[in-house]
Amino acid sequence: MSMRKIYLISDTHFNHANIIKYCNRPFSNVEEMNKTLIKNWNNVVRDKDIVYFLGDLILSKNKAKKARELLELLNGEIVFIRGNHDKFGEKFRVIEYNGYKFMLIHNPDSSYTLNFDGWIIHGHHHANHLDEYPFINPKRKSINVSVEVINYKPVSLDLIVKLIEKGKVVRTINDL
């Protein structure tokens, strides 16, 4: 039997038209963006996999109802960490994997991260501050999994571990 994989992703902002302009996303409209994000997610994640979603799932009217409908379409067991636009989810979670300690949190500048000695996996900054918050930042021990940085699909924790072991800055997943 194959192992469950662990994936991470943040800041999908489903249904949020302005995010396309604001973050320079390569979509012409919300429908295209939503469809692509769902397709990318389901091409990567299988039903038994775990996805840590690090906040800001959806922005729309009837958000709770729309979020439930959306989640029906996405593969995997999804664990929610609350983003600044969310009303649900844990504030953060600490996990251990392959000998590393990771704090999963939406905003890396949160006071919860202050005395944490492991790696911080976060979203929130999108691709707007890549010098400070690239995909992999060994100096800060931070990992940015905002969708713009990871090419609009969930990224595996196995890949993240491989990259942090190399000890190099990786601006976006497209630089690999």
Curated annotation (Swiss-Prot):
Pfam families: Metallophos (PF00149). CDD domains: MPP_AQ1575 (cd07390). GO terms for molecular function: hydrolase activity. SUPFAM superfamilies: Metallo-dependent phosphatases. This is Uncharacterized protein MJ1445. It comes from Methanocaldococcus jannaschii (strain ATCC 43067 / DSM 2661 / JAL-1 / JCM 10045 / NBRC 100440).
